[in-house]
């Protein structure tokens, strides 16, 4: 993994699908990257985990969401939002915009309604 992963438009992109990892490899990369990010000023992370070829939800997506649900990383993560919930009118989208009013400036169209991503807001975030 490169020392400084991709960051575009105020959002750090963590691609967990790259090189078709196993679930364990993806979780390890997720853990390692979050540890690295805790040492930076990065505030928002777009986690690309895919949504599974069957359309039901991939194993990496499910594993990452389980990690976030149980908040095993509460020392780093403030909140997270499923890509499929990032749509105007959805409660999660409204909550995200209320807590982070400038987030609209960095969300891209490919993120809105995308079940293959999860948006993570780091605990120290003041966007």
Segments (PLM) and residue ranges:
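Long, charged, low-complexity intrinsically disordered regions
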Residues: 1-127
């Amino acid at each position: 993994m490169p020392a400084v992963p991709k960051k575009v438009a105020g959002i750090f992109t963590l691609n967990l699908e790259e090189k078709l990892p196993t679930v364990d490899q993806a979780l390890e990369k997720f853990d390692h990257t979050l540890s690295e990010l805790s040492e930076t000023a990065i505030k928002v992370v777009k986690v690309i985990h895919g949504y599974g070829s069957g359309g039901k939800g991939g194993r990496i997506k499910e594993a990452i969401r389980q990690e976030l649900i149980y908040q095993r990383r509460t020392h780093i993560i403030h909140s997270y939002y499923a890509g499929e919930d990032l749509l105007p009118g959805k409660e999660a989208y409204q909550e995200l915009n209320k807590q982070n009013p400038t987030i609209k400036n960095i969300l891209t169209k490919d993120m809105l309604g995308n079940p293959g991503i999860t948006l993570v807001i780091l605990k120290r975030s003041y966007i």
